[in-house]
Design a protein with these regions (language model features):
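N-terminal maturation segment of proteins
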Residues: 1-550
Length: 550
């Protein structure tokens, strides 16, 4: 066990400050003591947090660096906290509205992670729901300041968010459903019902504000522009990239993956078959179909458990606590698939969540096996779980709090490709993996293209990328149900920089591995590389590159 240093103490204090400033983060990380609270989203609270960031950055600079772990912590905290402060100073939080990752969804989805076994647990749920009005009032206050300063989200994102708020405000609000399904009685049941009414009313008020005040003031253009995109890209990658070179690489990658997929389609369905023909053949095979969410959950669990058994000790060295993962069906029904990490003590295991859209009852294993590898092992669960298991060697900021999308999502895509390289996919499942790769390459082209005003493909009429051209690009390259595909497009438009972090992150991970292979020559050991890379936790990718080159 490593002896904690003064810099670790700075990092630990920052975790405690973060838990108080944003209790949602405490719940996400499994930190106790804040499950009854909600954040203050007001401009005043954000200003206080900016002061805390400045203070912590000063302490990080001044603290002695006694070992390599300290050097890594200092580099990562300087990059992450410095960028967060830069974003606050630019006012990015004043336009934080989209359909997938903004205060609206954070406040909705946090209840999925809260314990609900005891009366005390349910009392926390009631307290959080009762605090919703104050939390959303602070959020509205920040959005109003954004209007006054001319920092506003796109109108399309506001319309989507207003629809989500409305869905949370009616008599069938999920908050009322929480209270009704609690199994509690007496005074606690009454408190849950009262709190659910407060939460539903608060979201109704938010929906009216979004519709009547923010939507008329919102910008018509979906694109955020290069200046905002610079910060967004760094937020999700932890690396500085050449946008123009990366866009051209994305175009080339999309073409290469498409050719690879087309060749495999001919192998599956005949010499003249298209990708659509191969997909139709795979979808028609009953062996590839799952009916109902219960069967989907069971298949997710079985597939994840099989991967853990096959990989542990051969390609990776799993901490025994990481061998447990749970497949879950999310109650939100929005169409996303995501992972939530274990709590600090592993009392809450890592979980794969499938948010199944309303009316979707049939699922295809050939297309989704790679998704389980992405969310489970060797993807997010291995990566996040191994970091949490390093708590005795890493401070809590490193093991629990620091999460960089390009590092995490890039690793998960890298993991998908590894499963193909290791021979775990049959031809149909490999087509599914390539389908996912094609989606991620499409995201690079679309996201950089629309937000930076890049020229659209001639086959879509030239000019610059806009909504209709982006939709056609997705329709031509992504095998996804139409409602979910529309949700994806709106996600990219409203959450700039996040979607391309997957494939760009994979690219950087592969560059780092190839660099290590060249340095080590015949002594290169893939399992050792993986173990070392995962042991340092999630890092900004520029920091990771330096660490693994050392």
């Amino acid at each position: 066990m490593r002896t904690p240093t003064s810099l670790d103490a700075v990092a630990e204090a920052h975790v405690d400050a973060l838990a108080s400033h944003n209790p949602l983060n405490a719940t996400w990380c499994g930190l106790p003591g804040h499950d009854h609270e909600l954040p203050d989203f007001s401009p005043e609270a954000t200003g206080r947090w900016a002061d805390e960031l400045r203070r912590t950055l000063h302490l990080v600079r001044e603290a002695p660096k006694v070992d390599e772990a300290d050097e890594v912590t200092a580099a990562a905290m300087t990059e992450r906290l410095g960028l967060e402060l830069e974003s606050i100073e630019a006012g990015d939080q004043l336009a934080a509205v989209n359909n997938i990752d903004s205060p609206i969804q954070w406040l909705r989805d946090i209840f999925d992670l809260m314990p609900t076994k005891t009366d005390s647990d349910w009392a926390n749920v009631a307290s959080r729901m009762a605090a919703m009005s104050e939390a959303l009032d602070g959020y509205i206050e920040s959005l109003r300041e954004g209007i006054s300063r001319g920092i506003v989200p796109a109108r399309r994102a506001v319309v989507d968010a207003a629809a989500q708020a409305a869905a949370l405000s009616g008599q069938d609000s999920r908050f009322r459903g929480l209270a009704a399904g609690s199994g509690r009685s007496g005074a606690l049941r009454g408190e849950l019902e009262r709190a659910a009414g407060i939460a539903a009313e608060a979201f109704g008020n938010l929906g009216r504000f979004l519709t009547t005040e923010l939507a008329p003031a919102a910008r018509k253009a979906d694109a955020v522009g290069r200046e905002r995109y610079q910060r967004a890209s760094r937020e999700f990658l932890g690396a500085r990239i050449d946008f123009d070179e990366t866009y051209e690489w994305g175009v080339e990658s999309l073409a290469a993956i498409t050719a690879e997929q087309e060749a495999l389609a001919r192998e599956i369905a005949g010499s003249s078959a298209t990708v659509a023909d191969a997909i139709a053949q795979l979808n028609a095979d009953p062996a590839n179909l799952i009916h109902g969410t219960d069967a989907l959950r069971d298949w997710m669990q079985r597939t994840a458990d099989e991967a853990i058994s096959a990989l542990d000790g051969r390609y990776f060295t799993l901490d025994p606590r990481v061998r447990t993962i749970e497949g879950m069906i999310a109650p939100s029904a929005t169409g996303g698939i995501y992972y939530t990490g274990p709590s600090a003590d592993f009392s809450r295991p890592g979980r794969m969540w499938w948010s199944v859209p309303e009316g979707v009852t049939e699922f295809t294993t050939w297309q989704e096996k790679t998704t389980v590898h992405h969310e489970g092992v060797p993807g997010h669960h291995l990566q996040v779980g191994q970091a949490v298991a390093q708590a005795e060697n890493l401070n809590r900021w490193r093991s629990l709090v620091c999460w960089v999308s390009g590092h995490g999502e890039g690793w998960a895509l890298y993991a998908e490709r590894l499963m193909d390289e290791f021979g775990f996919l049959n031809p149909g499942e490999r087509l599914g993996m390539l389908d996912g790769q094609r989606l991620r390459a499409t995201r690079v082209v679309l996201d950089l293209g629309v937000h930076l005003g890049k020229p659209a493909f001639d086959r879509y009429g030239g000019g610059i990328w806009d909504y209709d051209k982006c939709w056609q690009l997705l329709r031509d390259n992504v095998a996804m149900e139409e409602n979910q595909l529309r949700f994806e497009l709106h996600r990219y438009l409203g959450w700039a920089g996040q979607a391309p972090s997957y494939l760009i992150g994979q690219r950087i991970w592969e560059q780092i591995r190839d660099d290590a292979n060249r340095r080590s020559g015949q002594d290169f050991d893939l399992r050792d590389f993986h173990d070392r890379a995962l042991a340092v936790g999630s890092l900004p990718l520029d920091v990771l590159r330096e660490v693994l080159a050392g």
